[in-house]
């Protein structure tokens, strides 16, 4: 074989080697390009205006009950409100492209009728974060709208899949925590899941996420979103057995109040302006106690309409008491000194004014409560352990305290009115001729009514002070149940005060005797013969 053949053979071998190397390089390039097409994340998927989550591939570990944390997150095909650092596919080459290869998480967020989004401040108010460490906050009137992102998602072992279903949730108002941690949207992204729990995704660093069930979410006046998550869960406030016991006392008070209301509406001698006001006052308290006790005994949800009905009834009770105190003052300072004899039409007009005031006042307060999104349940059976519970009573405790204070002032003014008018009774014995005849019997009746009203006022003030002590006390001491017992027995106090006094007892016994069920003794007949008809 000559030299030319060898040269030809070497050329063929070199050409074959070149083609093989070119084929291998082409295969590697195609493989690399395909890998980049399936794993690369475009910058435009993380922009400042997007709000939906498509899916997330995340490594998950359980932290504490009802709290789940994930680390080493690889977010694929997701869009968030701000830029989130994306992990290179070279770092995690085995991560799947979606959640289909992941095991579904054992506990899933499920939307229920009771699912709520927890807002820190009432409607129309925003957070005011103050102090350097941002450890304290309060709610101020604000104009910024609160529109958090709500998603429906499925939790997998290392992945979150957005179902892209439009979801809406009602709001619960207030911070439910004894102590809390503060998150803000500078470092985290917040989403609310379909069951009302909060999904927190870390923008920077370890690319982790957390799900919290006990939290509240709101914005400050600059538009930044903040989340307060509970460090410790709220303890049970009052044992169920104690709640049932006090609720039973309320049910015992109810027939006493209904009896007072019925007798003052039925008996002609008791059916005057004072008696009708007392009747409606007792009826309002009986209605509130009945609904309140049934709700707690049977565990009926007290959010929404039922809570507002109870709030309206209890507030009406205090407003009617204020009307009764004002009626005593009106008699002492105007009707008795001026010898005013009220006609039936004037008494009807006077009662209508009382009714408008006693019902429109509570209705206005309930309307404000609804507007702010606060629960309407009164503070009975509650302890203000958290900010949300304390804030829920802003339209119950301050109004009732104000009404009782005004009633106390009216009773004091009425007392000085009695001191002033007592001179008329003494002067009547010495003066033979008077321009107008002073009604001594009416004076005695008003005086007895004033004594009963003042005694009831003392009981109401004492029971209300005990209620405030119970609400703001942070302990579960046994003496707190005694405070609630005094409140639960208010119907019994009303019965004893307004029906056991001698003149009313005599009138009731006479009414009973007319039906053949009682024999009136001589002293009672003598008292009746001296009383006006």
From Swiss-Prot:
Cellular localisation: Cell membrane
GO function term, MF aspect, one: G protein-coupled receptor activity
A GO CC annotation given for this chain: plasma membrane
Keywords carried by this UniProt record: Cell membrane, Disulfide bond, G-protein coupled receptor, Glycoprotein, Membrane, Receptor, Signal, Transducer, Transmembrane, Transmembrane helix
Glycosylation: residue positions: 20, 29-30, 36, 47, 133, 178, 206
Ranges facing Cytoplasmic side: 264-279, 325-347, 417-451, 502-533
Entry's transmembrane regions: 243-263, 280-300, 304-324, 348-368, 396-416, 452-472, 481-501
Signal sequence range: 1-23
Location (main, coarse): membrane
Alphabetical list of Gene3D superfamilies matching this protein: Methuselah ectodomain, domain 2, Rhodopsin 7-helix transmembrane proteins
Mode of membrane association: Multi-pass membrane protein
Topology, Extracellular side: 24-242, 301-303, 369-395, 473-480
Region (Disordered): 86-108
Name recorded for this polypeptide: Probable G-protein coupled receptor Mth-like 14
Species for this entry: Drosophila melanogaster
Name of the coding gene: mthl14
């Amino acid at each position: 074989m000559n030299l030319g053949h060898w040269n030809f053979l070497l050329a063929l071998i070199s050409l074959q080697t070149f083609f093989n190397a070119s084929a291998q390089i082409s295969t590697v390039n195609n493989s690399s390009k395909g890998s980049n097409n399936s794993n690369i994340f475009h910058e435009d998927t993380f922009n400042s205006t997007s709000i939906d989550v498509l899916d997330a591939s995340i490594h998950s570990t359980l932290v504490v009950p009802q709290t789940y944390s994930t680390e080493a997150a690889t977010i694929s095909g997701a869009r968030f409100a701000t830029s989130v650092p994306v992990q290179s596919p070279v770092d995690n080459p085995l991560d799947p492209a979606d959640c289909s290869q992941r095991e579904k998480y054992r506990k899933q967020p499920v939307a229920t009728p009771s699912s709520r989004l927890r807002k820190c401040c009432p409607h129309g108010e925003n957070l005011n974060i103050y102090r350097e460490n941002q450890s304290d906050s309060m709610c101020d009137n604000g104009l910024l709208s609160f529109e958090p992102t709500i998603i429906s998602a499925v939790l997998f072992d290392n992945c979150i899949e957005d179902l892209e279903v439009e979801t809406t949730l009602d709001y619960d108002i207030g911070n439910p925590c004894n102590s809390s941690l503060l998150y803000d949207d500078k470092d985290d992204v917040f989403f609310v899941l379909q069951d009302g729990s909060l999904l927190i995704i870390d923008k920077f660093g370890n690319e982790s996420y957390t799900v919290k069930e006990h939290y509240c979410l709101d914005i400050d006046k600059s538009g930044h979103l903040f989340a307060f998550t509970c460090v410790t869960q709220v303890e049970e406030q009052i044992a169920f057995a104690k709640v049932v016991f006090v609720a039973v006392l309320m049910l015992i008070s109810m027939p006493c109040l209904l009896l007072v209301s019925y007798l003052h509406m039925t008996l002609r001698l008791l059916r005057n302006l004072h008696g009708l006001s007392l009747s409606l006052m007792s009826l309002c308290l009986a209605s509130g106690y009945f609904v309140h006790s049934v709700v707690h005994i049977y565990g009926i949800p007290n959010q929404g309409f039922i809570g507002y009905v109870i709030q309206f009834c209890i507030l009406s009770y205090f407003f009617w008491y204020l009307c009764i105190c004002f009626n005593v003052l009106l008699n002492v300072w105007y009707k008795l000194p001026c010898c005013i004899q009220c006609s039936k039409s004037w008494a009807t007009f006077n009662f209508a004014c009382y009714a408008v005031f006693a019902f429109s006042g509570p209705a206005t307060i309930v309307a404000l409560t609804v507007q702010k999104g606060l629960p309407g349940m009164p503070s009975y059976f509650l302890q203000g352990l958290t900010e949300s519970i304390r804030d829920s009573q802003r339209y119950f405790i301050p109004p009732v305290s104000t009404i009782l204070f005004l009633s106390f002032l009216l009773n004091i003014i009425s007392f000085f009115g009695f001191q002033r008018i007592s001179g008329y009774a003494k002067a009547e014995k010495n003066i033979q001729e008077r321009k107008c005849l002073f009604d001594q019997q009416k004076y005695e009746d008003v005086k007895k009514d004033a004594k009963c009203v003042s005694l009831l006022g003392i009981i109401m003030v004492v029971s209300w002070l005990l209620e405030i002590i119970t609400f703001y006390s942070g302990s579960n001491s046994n003496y707190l149940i005694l405070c609630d017992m005094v409140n639960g027995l208010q119907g019994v106090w009303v019965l004893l005060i307004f029906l056991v006094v001698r003149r009313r007892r005599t009138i009731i016994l006479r009414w009973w005797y007319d039906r053949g069920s009682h024999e009136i003794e001589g002293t009672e007949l003598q008292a009746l013969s001296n009383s006006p008809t």
